[in-house]
């Protein structure tokens, strides 16, 4: 059983991800930007004042020995299952890019499952922040979350010009050098070889997103963690900030494209 909520531009389907993905057509989505369960710790370890599930004690509301917020969706290892990512792969258009968040200590398990499902992993984005807290005295302070960058088959360009950082004016003639072997001009800002003017598009996007550390991070896209106002009424402790998600969607999705989460 499932139900659908239709908004102006979005549709929310409350259903089992694997089972419902099987009902969708092939080659539908232009990109996938998702924050799947991290499958980390038990509810007892993370939340000492946990209450009984609000709507019941069975099914997806059952308290499990593992699972973020005590929910089955985080107690399971769906993000590590090749079968799940194969369904995501099937519904994406050729050349579509997948961006998926993961925890630092089990990123590799999700990445392997994504690769085994048929995706080509071509990079990783690091979302870096300075507001994390170590869970125990013998652990490092958490300061980043990795994001898998994977592609379905065909190599299509990212929307890099739409995600440039800052608004500095660059004179391309100052960023040209001659290759010693073939004497071809190389423009270090990713510009066309015959372009000789100036632009106001900011710096070339990097595979790092930061949350405002006390240093010179002008070359990287800035995005702080979601604050209390942005979280709204939800009590979920790991809500991703809207600016971060908008940036990622813009990076990998064509104009008027359809995004799978």
Where does each model-flagged region fall?
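Core catalytic lobe of class I
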Residues: 2-260
